[in-house]
C-alpha cells in the first residue's frame, strides 16, 4: 500500500480498462480551470517520490534519473509528518475529509476492488 498515490489540485479519472500509459485522464485543475499537458506545474511530494522512489518520475513521467535533482526547487530538512503535527498543534483539532477529486472507472470494476481492499486493510 506504500505504492498507492493520489494527487490533489487536479480532478481526474483512472480508467482501469485502458492500456498502460493511458489510464489517467485529467479533467481540470481542482478550481475548474483548464489543465494543459504543455504547461509546467510545481508539484509537492514526499522525499521517497521526489528522489525517484517507485519509478513514478522515471518510468511513469519519463524523466531521466539524472534530471530529477535539477528539477527540485525546495527540499525541507523536516519530513511531512512534522508539518502535519505542527498544523494539528496550531489548529487544536482537525476534521479531515476526502477531496473527492478522482475516481476509478468503470464502477463495475472499481466497487468489487474497493470491497476487497477494505477487507484486506480493515478485516471487514
Task: Pin down the residues of each PLM region.
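Catalytic centers of hydrolytic enzymes
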Residues: 1-124
